[in-house]
UniProtKB/Swiss-Prot annotation:
Organism, as annotated: Staphylococcus aureus (strain bovine RF122 / ET3-1)
Family: Belongs to the UPF0354 family.
Record protein name field: UPF0354 protein SAB1603c
Length: 285
């Protein structure tokens, strides 16, 4: 499977939509946009081809579903009927776009050195990121949006699965509701897990649809956590960060796990290596 074949496959699978396609050969991207208002999304074909080797048709099904929902929600409609319970926070990498394609600033806040909090209108099977142009229609201020979103994320179910590896306990929150990573903002939930931990508590949001919490009880646990975060980071549809965070009494601190049972707090040399790796990953996508 190459990018041209993937382009053709996606165009065939999306032929039921009233959209146009624009293929960029140099960047290996496919833009899919509505014919009525030209709103759409751009897909990096190279990244999908890489994932196709492992996931086969499953990754195509995921992309088609994602495009279906996104295109449907891009129809021009009023936001006046949106209720406060539909305002949610979403976690993104600090490198995520700060403005819409039309140049309108998104509403967002800094979170950690690796993550930022954006805000969205929940639309059922998808959501729409809130930008400054939407505030008037929503009849909300930025502060009200922040408060509503944090209130709503705390109401989400926090069910999880656990796994023990070499004496270390790992918790996986993977409800696939679009807000798994957002649960990192639920301090009460994190404190609840912290109270159960016997070792150092680490937290990770490698992509949008998973939150990993680890109770690191021995040195092997750091290596396992590093492997897990990188594995999830490279396979997520919306990658966030491959870095883990130390968690203590409501405070998150990014750490870099060097491998072979070592870890290092964030310093300039570590930052340079991380940024170099991230640029390479984004280029490969």
């Amino acid at each position: 499977m190459n990018t041209f074949q993937m382009r053709d496959k996606l165009k065939e699978r999306l032929s039921h939509l009233d959209v146009d396609f624009k293929f960029n050969r140099e960047e290996e991207t496919l833009r899919i946009y509505r014919t009525d208002n030209n709103k759409g999304i751009t897909i990096k074909l190279n990244a999908i081809v890489v994932k196709y080797e492992d996931k086969k048709e499953k990754i195509v099904d995921e992309i088609v579903y994602y495009v279906d929902e996104a295109i449907a929600q891009m129809a021009d409609k009023t936001l006046e009927s949106i209720s406060s319970s539909q305002i949610m926070p979403v976690i993104r990498a600090t490198s995520f776009n700060k403005k819409t394609k039309q140049g309108v600033p998104f509403i967002y806040d800094e979170h950690t050195a690796e993550t930022a909090v954006y805000y969205a209108v929940d639309l059922g099977k998808s959501y729409r990121l809130i930008d400054e142009s939407m505030l008037e229609d929503l009849k909300l201020t930025e502060q009200q949006i922040r408060e509503m979103s944090l209130f709503n994320v705390r109401k989400l179910s926090n069910s999880y699965t656990t796994d023990e590896v070499k004496g270390n306990i790992f918790y996986f929150i993977n409800s696939n509701d679009g807000y798994d990573a957002s649960r990192i903002l639920n301090t009460a939930f994190l404190n609840e897990i912290e109270a159960q931990c016997q070792g150092e508590m680490l937290v990770a949001v490698p992509h949008q649809d998973v939150l990993i919490i680890a109770d690191i009880r021995n040195k092997t646990g750091y290596d396992v956590m590093a492997h897990l975060t990188m594995e999830f980071f490279t396979k997520g549809l919306v990658p966030i960060t491959s870095l883990s965070f130390g968690y203590k009494q409501g405070h998150l601190e990014p750490i870099f796990i060097l491998g072979k049972n070592n870890k290092q707090k964030r310093d300039p040399n570590v930052i340079q290596r991380l940024e170099a790796n991230r640029r390479k990953f984004n280029k490969d996508k």
